[in-house]
Amino acid sequence: MPVWERSSTARVVPPARPRKLAKVPFVELADGRLQGVVSSGSDAGRVYVSSIATATYAFACSTNNNRPCGGARGTFCNHIRALVGEAVLQYGAERVARYLKADTPDGEPDAPRLVSVMTAARPEQGDTSAAAPVFSRFLRHLAYLELEPTTAPLPEMQWFPPTRTVA
């Protein structure tokens, strides 16, 4: 384990399996939702912000400029299904199922079973108000990827309390 990781207060969790970032470049389990950014299948310049709420499975899918997804009418669209699939790759099926409170009674959870359990509950279409903050975090994530590797602290992270000196 690298020194910077040992001295960190938050552990870096490696992905359950490697995944390609072209279709779903951003996935997170946060704010009581599985949420992320999903690329459009038809337009390279368009992305969708999709989310599923914990326990209720209320879902939302809209473009980054808040236009509703045409496929998310009464059930999960392909963007949400892709989001679940990539979340399972990123975090592992057990962790995603536990976070969403989706019990798969017929064995080991995987992406199709999770989608099946959630759609069987007939979830309602949720609020799309979270799309802007999720997209903003995605853009911030992209900005961090463009930075040169360094051990110097990032200015916007200075509000974290120091735990100990870095070796």
Give short role names for the model-derived ranges.
Residues 1-167:
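Long, low-complexity, compositionally biased intrinsically disordered regions
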